[in-house]
């Protein structure tokens, strides 16, 4: 219990496990609140299988506004970019940027999620569980070796109903990372299992799950499993969700969501039951002992490429089984998007013609398609007005209202609500102050001069600038930082004293009372 807030962790954690363990980039367990924390801890695991979370391994509390930038690699049974196994009521505004690679060298069933690997792993007292405004941009993959099966989702690996958990919602979450695995793969959720048996008895509690406003633009690649293992060798993947198994009374409701990611079969061999759905791979409804489950898919669009070599391939749902299933408002006949293996993005009109020399909005992101029909990526370029500069990121998405690291120029910039680059501007986010210099680069990691050529400031490692009063310059001399980050020069006062600061570099010279 308790709270952990506003902390950053760096480093590398190498684990040679001899037994099952829980490992977190920040904490093993959380029963309180983890908020505004960052992990840059790389986790490498060998030996026995373990459960890993980029922030926390086991969570029964609240996790908010946390970011994981560390990579996770090794022999891992459950791996989540933020949480390994979740039983908490709220996970919100979390971001995973770290890559996850699982070595599935045996017959185990692995669970991998960009945000949460296993959601619903505890008998919860709460009746509602919410995952809100979370994003994964890390690439998730399993190695080719071994006979294991993977449940991999861009946001959630496996969503299960257990105990008294009655309502779960995943709202406004998105995955832009690429997913590659053998087994079940879904752009948002890999596997939904509601009505799970415990000690051979059906869970009696009715349960509902809602997915609303979620989006996948990551490329999904399905690999066939080794025929010598205990699992079927088929490839199973869906743009939003993979497979489902629902037997308890209640409703699964997936709505207002979309996929623009491409779905590919790896290699040239096609299995008899390979199944791909642009929205979902398979819906299975299994009424049990008088239960009445319902499954609705509403207003969900697939705009991405679907590999038609699969035995069962659909723009919407690859396969379904059972009653009380409705798919409505999901027909789509507009622009289509295809991402090549090297990340090159193409867009096509409904008639198959390439889109060129044009900005295009896919419902979530804006792209610019060049004369050769490929999307501009990692490029600072002029807006059509010829005045403002915009940025298309490594996924081809125009950036709005956000700080963004631009690999092509090697620095972090800020883009406003219209996508325009900030240059020579001081900006405020919460209690933090930032300065974007004349080139648009965020000042960080040391002293800098403002574009006016006169004033100095100090940028911290995280890009915030000192704006909190008294401090020191590089020579150990006392200086004063104004609210806007500029080092004070000349005469300043706090109402009780006047302070004389050097007119050139701002170092402290002396003081005298205001009353003199």
What is each PLM-predicted segment?
Residues 1-334, 341, 386-388, 454-455:
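Surface-exposed loop/turn motifs in large extracellular/passenger domains
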Residues 334-516:
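Extracellular adhesion/carbohydrate-binding repeat motifs centered on closely spaced tryptophans
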């Amino acid at each position: 219990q308790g709270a952990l807030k506003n902390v950053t962790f760096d480093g590398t954690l190498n684990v040679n496990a001899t037994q099952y363990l829980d490992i977190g980039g920040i904490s093993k367990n959380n029963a309180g609140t983890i908020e505004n924390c960052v992990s840059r801890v790389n986790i490498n695991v060998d030996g026995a299988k373990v459960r890993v979370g980029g922030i926390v391994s086991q969570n029964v509390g609240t996790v908010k506004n946390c970011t994981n930038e560390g990579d996770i690699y090794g022999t891992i049974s459950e791996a989540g970019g933020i949480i390994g196994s979740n039983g908490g009521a709220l996970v919100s505004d979390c971001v995973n940027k770290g890559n996850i690679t699982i070595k599935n060298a045996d017959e185990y069933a692995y669970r991998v999620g960009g945000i949460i690997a296993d959601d619903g792993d505890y008998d919860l007292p709460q009746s509602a569980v919410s995952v809100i405004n979370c994003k994964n941009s890390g690439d998730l993959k399993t190695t080719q070796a071994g006979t294991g099966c993977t449940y991999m989702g861009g946001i959630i690996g496996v969503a299960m109903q257990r105990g008294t958990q009655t309502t779960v919602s995943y709202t406004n979450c998105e995955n832009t990372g690429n997913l590659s695995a053998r087994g079940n793969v879904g752009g948002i959720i890999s596997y939904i299992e509601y009505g799970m048996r415990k000690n051979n008895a059906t869970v009696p509690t009715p349960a509902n799950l809602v997915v609303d406003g979620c989006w996948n633009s990551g490329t999904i690649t399905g690999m066939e499993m080794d025929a010598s293992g205990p699992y079927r060798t088929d490839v199973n993947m869906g743009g939003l969700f993979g497979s489902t198994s629902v037997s308890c009374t209640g409703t699964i409701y997936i709505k207002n969501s979309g996929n623009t990611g491409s779905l590919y079969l790896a290699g040239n061999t096609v299995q008899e039951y390979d199944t791909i759905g642009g929205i979902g791979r398979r819906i299975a409804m299994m009424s049990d002992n008088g239960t009445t489950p319902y499954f609705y898919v509403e207003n969900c669009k697939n705009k991405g490429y679907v590999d038609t070599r699969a035995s069962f391939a659909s723009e919407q749902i690859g396969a379904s089984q059972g009653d009380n299933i409705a798919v409505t408002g999901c027909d789509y006949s507009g622009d289509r998007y295809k991402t090549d293996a090297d990340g090159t993005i193409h867009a096509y009109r409904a008639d198959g013609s390439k889109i060129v020399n044009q900005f295009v909005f896919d419902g979530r992101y804006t792209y610019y398609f060049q004369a050769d029909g490929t999307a501009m990526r990692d490029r600072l370029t002029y807006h059509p007005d010829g005045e403002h500069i915009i940025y298309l990121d490594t996924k081809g998405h125009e950036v709005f209202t956000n700080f963004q690291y631009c690999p092509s120029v090697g620095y972090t910039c800020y883009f406003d609500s219209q996508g325009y680059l900030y240059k020579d501007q001081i900006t405020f986010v919460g209690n933090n102050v930032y300065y974007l210099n004349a080139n648009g680069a965020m000042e960080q990691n040391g002293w800098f001069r403002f574009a006016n050529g006169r004033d100095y400031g100090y940028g911290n490692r995280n890009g915030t600038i000192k704006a909190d009063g008294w401090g020191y310059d590089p020579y150990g001399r006392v200086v004063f930082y104004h609210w806007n980050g500029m080092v004070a020069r000349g005469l300043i006062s706090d109402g009780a004293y006047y302070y004389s600061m050097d007119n050139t570099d701002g170092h402290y010279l002396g003081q005298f009372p205001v009353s003199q």
